[in-house]
Amino acid sequence: MYVKRGFYFNILGGSFMEKWTDKVIVAVHYEDTNDPRRVIEKVKVEDDDGDSLKNKVVMLRKSVVADIENNISYVTAYKDDDGKYKEGKKVIIDIVNGVKYIKTEKNDKTEDNLDKLEEF
């Protein structure tokens, strides 16, 4: 497999597969589901190798924050009707009142928000 301008070229298949990011968040677990702030405790993450998502692991929220601060990129992903993951949005850190939240969009809310990912 070769990398060329952000794409992976599969020598055997001769097709281009776009790499979304370094890591993909596919599910979330909230600290307290009754808390309206919705703070994530941990996430299920897979590596994006350009052809598929691999190596599913559970990571603590603080590890995701540290990775993003160290320039490791994340996006969300959702399963379609065929059970295949589709790329969601880029995950960012949004600091509100001095607290770092992981979100897909900046806003003034004191909560994590990765849209409507599967919960575990």
Q: Positions of the model-derived regions?
A:
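Short, Lys/Arg-enriched N-terminal segments with co-localized hydrophobic residues
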Residues: M1-F16
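Positively charged, low-complexity intrinsically disordered regions
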Residues: G6, R38-V39, K62
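Short, compact, well-ordered microdomains
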Residues: D80-F120
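Short, surface-exposed binding/anchoring microloops in extracellular/periplasmic proteins
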Residues: M17-V45
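A generic structural signal for short, non-catalytic loop/turn and secondary-structure boundary residues
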Residues: Y2, E18, E69, K84-K86, ...
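Acidic, aromatic-enriched beta-alpha/helix-loop junctions
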Residues: V43-I92
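A broad, low-specificity signal marking well-ordered, structured residues that form hydrophobic/aromatic
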Residues: K23, Y74, K100
